[in-house]
Amino acid sequence: MKPAFNTQRWFGLWPGLIVALLLAVLIVGTLTAVGGASHSFSVAVTLFDPYVLQVMRFTVWQATLSTLISVILAIPVARAYARRPVFIGRGILITLMGLPVVMPVIVAVFGIVAVYGRSGLLNTVLQPAGLTIPLEIYGLTGILLAHTFFNLPLAIRLMLPAWDQVTAENWRTASTLGMSSGQLFRFVEWPAISAFLPGVVVIVFLLCFTSFAVVLTLGGGPSATTIEVAIYQALRFEFDPGQAAILALTQLFLCVCSALLLIRWLRVLTPTPGRRNDPTIRPDTATRSGKLLDFGAILVCSLFVFAPIAALVLSGLRGPLVSVILDIGLWQAAARSLGIAVTATSLAGVMAFGL
């Protein structure tokens, strides 16, 4: 018997289908129009060019390294915050962890250079003791450092809810069995983290993969160029819309493939309803070594993230602060930015609701 047409289900699907169709038409149409404006629209020549292949390899390599560093470092820091849910300033620190995400990238890069550059604050402090850190801020090292600055706090905030998935019964059972801190992480905490890890890895990887301003300012040369920067170079310096369109499509294809592979490779678990993390039911929070490790991890992470921000604030206070605040151009730019942000947020919200 032929099933009846489900009208209600269709009306529930059409908003998402319309939004998806509009996005597909916008992306494909824009790239096709840009590529059609070029007389050198050759996919094979562009994709198999040695320079383009090197750019693709470097893009994937730096995104992979940045993701591994950010996520691996985020796990112990997030665990430290989870094991110490009550201490003075905890909420403020977690809230301020969102600053790197909303900061202008170029401004943040200036702060990173001011702290970790050759003549930065870190080497200035160590110099009287005869110590220096030979950190090459321009090149792959600088890119990884900047990506970690932006994505480490994001990964921490995204993974913190994982500990709320662990039930009180699990903690009590672990306490009864006398589990060590390492056993707790392996058998109790890791299954909860695994439910959040795929999403965190995909988000951080795609942010690093499509990074533009960081690579443009800290890349240091053609050997440290990503696809995003290559697109900019093709339009700005070579004026080759065809090559830019091919590179953009290639980046889109690689992003989709990378996200699908990462989600498939990493084990995805369904989050289980737990309870708010209670320090009184964890069997590993009372030891002195555990407290030192947790607060040490929180302190080091806070210094790493907030030092560039503090350097920017101090530099701004030493500048012509009053004249900048009274500059009408500043407020016009702020109003323009606010208008664009509100419009983009509204459109994104409506489209996301439809999808």
Predicted regions and their residues:
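Membrane-water interface segments at the C-terminal ends of transmembrane alpha-helices
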Residues: 7-41, 50-164, 192-219, 244-263, ...
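Glycine-rich helix-loop "coupling/hinge" segments at transmembrane-helix boundaries
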Residues: 114, 213-239
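Short helix-to-coil transition segments within interhelical loops
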Residues: 166-193
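Alpha-helical transmembrane segments of integral membrane proteins
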Residues: 261-297
